[in-house]
């Protein structure tokens, strides 16, 4: 496993109380980074931080679709330290249904979290990175954003939007020592699978040559 030196760096990880976000947080902590995990699930945040028990780990209860809440929290954080790294990992899958039967309210919720949430966090944090001439941003998208999954049009659209946002923002910040990238993982055994129907999970699995999800 590669070793990195993130001493004197501070990272914010959205959706950091479980799954990909939690594993990313642990790697950063192992590398000496100060980590702030953002999640909407207060109970899970508390149990996660208590279990890890690392003085470099803290959390905020954040709804990434709430820009006002984010800007207030960012202001409080940057009054004490810079934000060097942002991992936009928060996301939901929503129900599986064809577009013409998709619940409009749920469609909007998925876009608000998966796409607008990514924008909100970047919009609030990038000014601090520009001021300090340093930043690393990673947006967790999905292979669905490139391929488009049947019966998951909201999720696919939100992740496709996150990929486009990454490309645009990366070009805007290229001369400011701020790198912006996206990762597009396929299926992984996290709690997000619990939001999907068994039929949809099996359809995803059938596309994986090795017949298993990332663990």
Model-derived segments and spans:
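A conserved structural motif in NAD(P)-dependent oxidoreductases
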Residues: 208-215
